[in-house]
């Protein structure tokens, strides 16, 4: 006969009718309280993808840890780190959906950036040591607009030394904090849209809306802009307003993963899943395409390409597929 636990018994010397509100014979909270805490307040597996709004003065990692703790989330990850200076949208996934983040992080990102001219920063933003420029050149609106047009054509960018870019296995900022000179390689970027929102000629600052590709550093754009104008500049404030086509309207909503991918969807049945798990190709009559989202009901189970009406997998989430097949 199997052992059973009777929460209504007096095995722990408890008195009172409620299994969670009783006290011991000496008036201390009953052990039953701890069973209540364990069953109702332990961290739960809540699978979701959502957008959160990160405030200023906190790192993305710390913000996510606090959110996970508050919502009793066991495992969570985010895509597209925001510096502590910045606020705005952060793409977050939990449990198995964290595996999708590297694929979701390909979207363009839109920012509102406030830039101060006539000064420069060791980190290119307000978090570093800020120094004034001797005999600064006054920026005019015409000169600013011309420089923005030139900057929007940039296809390469050197990341800031105070960044998480890896150098010999360590983040660049690790060397920068020690005063060591390092050289970072330029990365490919694309500036899709540039709009000058506001320019204050008296205070020598401006607000710019930039839509950029993944990996683009807005503080590097601010520094480059200052140099183009034959002065210096730093990023004094930053807000991420959109990720792809998703803005603040989508905050705190649990979203279907397939709705976040800008890819053609290939819908599969159970038989297809079993064949793919065995490493077999399956016929799928559609136009040739290099990357597609593989869907079973509401689950993203992998990615694949279609060549000559044959589906060839690029990435399969095997454990997820096995779980589907076995249920």
Curated annotation (Swiss-Prot):
It is an enzyme of class 5 (isomerase). This is tRNA pseudouridine synthase B. Belongs to the pseudouridine synthase TruB family. Type 1 subfamily. The active site is at residue 83. PANTHER family: PSEUDOURIDYLATE SYNTHASE TRUB1 (PTHR13767:SF2), TRNA-PSEUDOURIDINE SYNTHASE (PTHR13767). Responsible for synthesis of pseudouridine from uracil-55 in the psi GC loop of transfer RNAs. Keywords: Isomerase, tRNA processing. Gene3D superfamilies: Pseudouridine synthase. InterPro entries: PsdUridine_synth_cat_dom_sf, PsdUridine_synth_N, tRNA_psdUridine_synth_TruB. HAMAP family: TruB_bact (MF_01080). Disulfide bonds: none annotated. The gene is truB. One of its GO terms (biological process) is mRNA pseudouridine synthesis. It catalyses: uridine(55) in tRNA = pseudouridine(55) in tRNA.
């Amino acid at each position: 006969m199997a052992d059973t636990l009777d929460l209504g018994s007096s095995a722990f010397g408890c008195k009172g009718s409620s299994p969670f509100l009783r006290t011991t014979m000496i008036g201390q909270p009953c052990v039953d309280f701890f069973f209540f805490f364990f069953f109702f307040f332990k961290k739960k597996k809540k699978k979701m993808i959502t957008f959160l709004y990160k405030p200023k003065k906190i790192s993305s990692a710390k913000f996510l840890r606090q959110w996970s703790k508050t919502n009793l989330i066991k495992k969570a990850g985010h895509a597209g780190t925001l510096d502590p200076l910045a606020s705005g949208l952060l793409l977050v996934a939990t449990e198995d959906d964290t595996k999708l983040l590297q694929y979701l992080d390909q979207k363009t990102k839109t920012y509102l950036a406030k830039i101060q001219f006539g000064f420069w920063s060791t980190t290119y933003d307000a978090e570093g040591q800020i120094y004034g420029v001797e005999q600064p050149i006054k920026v005019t609106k015409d000169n600013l607009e011309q420089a923005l047009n030139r900057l929007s054509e940039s296809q390469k960018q050197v990341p800031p030394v105070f960044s998480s870019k890896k150098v010999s296995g360590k983040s660049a900022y690790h060397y920068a904090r020690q005063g060591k000179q390092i050289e970072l390689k330029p990365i490919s970027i694309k500036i899709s849209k540039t709009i000058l929102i506001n320019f204050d000629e008296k205070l020598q600052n401006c607000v710019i809306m930039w839509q950029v590709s993944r990996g683009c550093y807005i503080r590097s754009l601010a520094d480059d802009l200052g140099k183009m104008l034959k002065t210096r500049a730093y990023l004094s404030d930053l807000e991420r307003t959109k990720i792809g086509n998703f803005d603040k309207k989508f905050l705190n909503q649990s979203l279907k993963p397939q709705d976040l991918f800008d890819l053609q969807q290939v819908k599969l049945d159970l038989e297809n899943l079993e064949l793919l798990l065995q490493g077999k190709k399956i016929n799928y009559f559609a136009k040739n395409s290099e990357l597609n989202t593989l869907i079973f009901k509401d689950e993203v189970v992998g990615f694949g390409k279609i060549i000559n009406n044959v589906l060839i997998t690029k990435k399969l989430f095997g454990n997820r597929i096995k779980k589907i097949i076995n249920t």
